[in-house]
Regions:
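Short C-terminal domain-edge/linker segments immediately following a structured domain
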Residues: 30-35, 75-79, 111-116, 172-177
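Metal-dependent peptidase/peptidase-like ectodomains
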Residues: 9, 47-154
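His/Asp/Glu-rich mid-to-C-terminal helical/loop segments that flank catalytic regions of hydrolases
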Residues: 29, 33, 40-42, 151-194
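Alpha-helical metal-binding/catalytic segments enriched in His/Glu/Asp
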Residues: 1-55, 177
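Generic secondary-structure signature for well-ordered alpha-helical cores
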Residues: 36, 65-66, 111-115, 182-190
Length: 194
C-alpha cells in the first residue's frame, strides 16, 4: 500500500499527497497498536516522482516485480496494492481497475463502513497515479474513491496547505486502509487477479 511524497513545484502538497501519506502511516500505527499478526507481510511504500511521471512506483515495479515481460521474484508474492492519492477528503469507495473478481470480497469488507458513506464499488480503471505500474504488471491494484471537496479546488495549486486538511476524514481513511490491508494479509489465498 502507498502514496507519494512529492508534489507539484508550486504546491505545498498537503492534500496531494500529504494526506495520503498521513493516512498510510496512521493505518500502519493502527495495525501495530492492535497487535495484528498477519499471514502475509503488509508493506507501505512512499513514492517519489509521482507528479513528474510515476517514476518511483515504475522503478520499483521494474526492479522487483516485472521488467518488461519478465516476472521477477516479488510478482508471485504481492497479493494487492492499495493506493491513496486523490486528496485529503473522506473515502467513499474503491476503484477496482476492472477487477470484477474482487467484488464479493470488497462488498463484505465495505460492510462495516456502510453507515459512513463508504459504499461505492467501481470497476472503473483510473490512471496517473502509482497503482498504474502494478496494474500493468498484473498485480491487483486499487485506488480509494474520495470526496472531491478539497482536492479538486486546491490540488496542484499554491493553496494546497495543511490548514485545509480535515483530520477526522484522514483518520476515517486510515481505518479503512488498515481494514483492507488486514483483510488482504489474513487471506490464505492471494486476491484474485484479472
Amino acid at each position: 500500500m502507498g502514496g507519494h511524497l512529492d508534489c507539484y513545484q508550486m504546491s505545498p502538497g498537503a492534500g496531494d499527497d500529504g494526506a495520503g501519506f498521513i493516512a498510510m502511516l496512521e493505518a500502519v500505527r493502527i495495525l501495530k497498536e492492535i497487535g495484528v499478526q498477519p499471514r502475509r507481510t503488509i508493506r507501505v511504500i512512499f513514492w517519489g516522482g509521482e507528479e513528474q511521471g510515476l517514476y518511483g512506483s515504475t522503478g520499483y515495479v521494474k526492479r522487483y516485480v516485472q521488467d518488461g515481460e519478465k516476472k521477477l521474484k516479488e510478482h508471485a508474492k504481492i497479493s494487492a496494492y492499495f493506493n491513496s492519492d486523490y486528496g485529503p477528503d473522506k473515502f467513499r469507495g474503491i476503484y477496482t481497475q476492472d477487477n470484477l473478481q474482487v467484488y464479493p470480497l470488497f462488498e463484505a469488507w465495505m460492510q462495516p463502513f456502510k453507515d459512513t458513506g463508504f459504499t461505492t464499488l467501481s470497476n472503473r480503471s483510473v490512471g496517473s497515479t502509482d497503482l498504474v505500474p502494478f496494474d500493468e504488471a498484473g498485480i491487483p491494484a486499487f485506488q480509494f474513491i474520495q470526496d472531491p471537496m478539497e482536492w479538486g479546488r486546491h490540488s496542484h495549486r499554491t493553496q494546497d496547505f495543511s490548514d485545509r486538511l480535515v483530520l477526522d476524514d484522514i483518520r476515517h481513511n486510515a481505518v479503512i486502509i488498515a481494514w483492507f490491508a488486514y483483510n488482504a494479509a489474513m487471506r490464505s489465498e492471494m486476491l484474485p487477479r484479472k
